[in-house]
Amino acid sequence: MKYRKFQLLMSKYGFSLLIMLLELSLVFGLFLYLGRMAPILWIIVLIFMSMATIVAIVNRSMAPESKVMWLVVTFVPIIGPLLYLMFGERRLSTKEIKQLNRLSSMHFREDNSKALRQKLKEDDKAAYGVIKSLLSMDSNADVYDRTDSQFFSSGESMWQHMLEDLKKAEKFIFLEYYIVEEGLMWNSILDILEQKAAQGVEVKMLYDDIGCMATLPGDYTIQLRSRGIEAHKFNKVIPRLTVAYNNRDHRKILVIDGQVAYTGGINLADEYINHIERFGYWKDSGIRLDGPGVKALTRLFLMTWYINRWEISDFDQYHLENQPCSGQGLCIPYGSGPKPIFRTQVGKKVYQSLINQATDSVYITTPYLIIDYDLTESIKNAAMRGVDVRIVTPFIPDKKLIQLITRGAYPDLLSAGVRIFEYSPGFIHSKQILVDKDFAAVGTINLDYRSLLHHYENAVLLYKTESIAEIQKDFQEIFSASQEIFPHTIKNSWYQKLVKEIAQLFAPIL
């Protein structure tokens, strides 16, 4: 581990960090120099910067918690306005806007989507409202039927099915992942990808540069291309201070021939299949789609693939005729991401919509629980109107500070009647919700600010599919393996409380 950290420090990432620190130091130094040479001018510049930043923050559409914290930060002389300028707001260039508009015009629309929505409106108005809300937030989402959905309650079971489906690929394979690490899981997949590329199958791979900076060598895209795999890093790290570094590609998508797709919480590394142990048993989940619903994940991948590249291939070549399946119910794969790429917080709004219309039960698993006032109130209100609301978080954390903040959310929720559990065997990384045994969502979205505000994410909303019974079974097994938290069991020292309060305060802007 120490050798890996040394390698990371001496790599391009360490160099980029050094350059960015130098840039920041240079700007800060110039301000100090100006303060010595022309103090009156310096004061005028400081006042102007602070006022301009405050006006920009007040007029910007953002979460109230984020707005308040940025206003607080702005009052720190020199540093505050500079931090907001560099990390507070991302603006798209004219070139990026044109590219985004071109990509948005390329649709894989489901032919009978309108009929499906109309039938749902007649049969179940509450369910129609949830789905209509999602479609209005994400113009790329659509409603699909005749799609089989298979739920996996562990990384190990999903991995084996992924290998079998990869071996059957004939036309193309798309992979988009946050973390990839050499080992049993990834190497077994890579061997098949190399074989398929040699057979003429088109293989595209996208992985997050920061997500993989400690797991893959800097030249790994070159290594993959030498094996016939077209590979790129998402949001590549370069020696420049920019707010875009906060926007990571946290998605996990595998698409095979436009017919089969996988997504969920499972990255391509050995801890996700429990081949190695990091934090006890690694509990994760995922879902496999087979049929027309795969179109949405195919398009979502292509949107991300081309968003930072100025050429666009014809999407129609990947718009293959899906073989309809016998799957019951509806599925709506969707994406979420940061502004201004996405108009609203899709991941958060879907959860709120589901929770607000719940009448019987709401079950949630999340590795982190750091949520804003709106979502907290939705959860509390559901519990107070008699809905059985249960949230499961890890007993063994991957980040102790994050667990401290997560546990800080417990008292408020418990007081409203929400039941909270911690998964005893280890670290629960599953990101799923089950509502009234009719709706479920499985994907990559954590209940924290980074996932809900800053990262590119994806999930699949399910309505009355066969897989919902398996999700319900998984929840019951999780509850049985977890310890319930009660108000009298929460004990923190004054030091822990102080750290928790400070961390919670700044969470919205981190």
Regions found by a protein language model. Give the residues of each.
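Charged, low-complexity intrinsically disordered terminal segments
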Residues: 2-23, 27-40, 114-510
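Transmembrane alpha-helices and immediately adjacent membrane-cytoplasm interface residues
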Residues: 45-116
